Amino acid sequence: MDLLCAGELNVDLVLSGFQSAPLLGMEIMGEDYTECLGSSTAICACVASSLGAATGFFGKLGRDHYGEIALQGLKKYNVDTTLVEISPKYRTGLTVSVSTADDRALVTCFGDTIDAFRQDEVPLERAN
C-alpha cells in the first residue's frame, strides 16, 4: 500500500436547483439532490487512488444507509476498505449542503464515528 488515509467518513447530501438558500422559517423547493461520499480525508484517498497510488482507508462507519454510501464511494475508486470498521453501534456522519450557483451553506453532524476514532488504532505498518 502506497498511502493509508485515516480519518472520519461521512456522506454529503447536496441539495440544488434553487436561486438562493431559504431563510429560517421559510421553505423553498429544490430541483435535485445527490448523496455521495464526503469528508476531505476520503476524497483525498479517492483522488490518490485514481492517480495510481495503491490506497487504503482506516476509519469507522455505521451499518446504516449512509455508511453503505460511503463504503461504495471508496470502492468506486478502488480504495482498499479492509481497514474500515463497520458496526451497528456507530451512526455515520452526514453533511447537508444547500448549494446555489454562487455559494453553499453546510450543516454537518459527525455521528458517532469521529468520537470512536482513536489514533493509536491506526495500523501504520500497513503503509509503505
Write out the residue ranges for each language-model feature.
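Glycine-rich phosphate/adenosyl-contacting loop at the front of the ribokinase-like
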Residues: 1-60, 65-69
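Conserved N-terminal subdomain of the carbohydrate kinase-like
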Residues: 26-27, 50-128
